[in-house]
Amino acid sequence: MRNSISGKTRLAGVIANPIKHSLSPMIHNTAYKVLNFDAVYLAFEVEQVEFEHAMNAVKTLDMMGINISMPYKKDAYDLCDELTERAKLIGVVNTVVNRNNKLLGDNTDGLGFIGSLKDYGVSVKGKVLTILGAGGAAKAAICQSALEGAKEIHVFKRQNETFESVKRDLEKISIETNVKIMVHGYHDKKAIEFALKESTLIVNSTQLGMGNNNDLPLDEMGLIKESHVVVDLIYHPLETPFLKQAKKSKALTINGLGMLVHQAAYAFKLMTGETMPVDKVIEKLKIELVREKEL
């Protein structure tokens, strides 16, 4: 296994602010090490005023590419030379690849969501989904689920100043994919009860339950059945209060670790041309997350 940096070592990384908490360097560097791939992946905390310079540096430094996290996914989208059709539909990018000194923007978050479901033998094709929350990760999951042939998607979002714009964005995805996507107010009790009865998959994309937060994203936990697949996009903790409660109904539960790694695996493939050793990476991450919990 390679453990030294030379003049031939390639560079990739992630840009966000804040970024010091990111698991992306561990994910990619673990994969490089397992594959003996001569590259290093770093985290770059960049201020808004410097973001465009940082994007240009991907070309200047001949980097393989860069991952983008909050709050720069839309800014990166606007600065790319080319975009995949998937990225155009979602409207933001999380991966920028340096292709012949042109920046190609893509969004692998939705692919990561689908990949995490496949690990459990779950498909969205022909299924009804309920999505709690409508942030960036949710939008990518909604878009990819529609592209993969979901039957119908119910989205529950807080009725704040972004409600109408998000609704318009999702209507665009609905038209492009010919999949019915309905956006409801987060506390629309009648709509949530109907959606849960119709749905196979229930997905939490809110931050409720993250870290030491013990709040549930759903009041109607009694409507979760054994036939449901319950997904939480949170991976810290690995088992949120939402998943613990869903387990009591004997539903299949899936945490966000798989989505995190699979979205990285697609980005890794775009940057390196290699297949990420997903099992080895997940094994390493689980050890690290348990260690952090014990600190």
Protein language model features and the residues they cover:
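Phosphate/diphosphate ligand-binding glycine-rich loop within oxidoreductases
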Residues: 2-120
